[in-house]
A protein has these predicted regions:
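Metal-dependent amide/peptide-bond hydrolase catalytic core
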Residues: 1-130
Length: 130
């Protein structure tokens, strides 16, 4: 017999994810040994946490304030940044979002329509950052 178990592990911090991954691996190995099974573990699409660097956050805040843009710190972490964590391991950067108000469908919904009016704001903010 052959079987497969697919799962996604997520955690707020890399250390928590490492512990969780080890626990799942240990449990799977134990179960396989008890039943005389061969276990193969593959990891795909592994990505690190996106942890903004304080200096990067400060630069974004100063640029936004210079343009008169409100800065709102999110109450909860956002995990929608699969690749950006790699960049932040190399540079003192910060991932930030441009809000378009509350009366718009969120990204990844079929009725999402990018608000073109944000382009000018985005360009001005990036110009301040460079």
């Amino acid at each position: 017999y052959r079987g497969a178990l697919l799962l996604t592990l997520r955690a707020q911090y890399q250390e928590e994810l490492d512990v969780l991954s080890q626990q799942v691996t240990d449990l799977a190995r134990q179960a396989a040994e008890e039943d005389g099974l061969t276990l193969t573990i593959e990891e795909q699409d592994v990505f690190p946490e996106t942890a903004n660097h304080p200096a990067g956050v400060e630069r974004v805040e100063k640029a936004a304030q210079a343009l008169g843009l409100p800065v709102v710190e999110m109450e909860e972490p956002m995990r929608g940044s699969e690749d950006f964590g790699w960049y932040l391991r190399q540079a003192e950067g910060a991932m930030f979002l441009l809000g378009d108000g509350e009366d718009h469908p969120p990204l990844h919904r079929t009725d999402f329509d990018f608000p073109d009016a944000l382009l000018g704001t985005a360009c001005a903010l990036f110009q301040k950052l460079i």
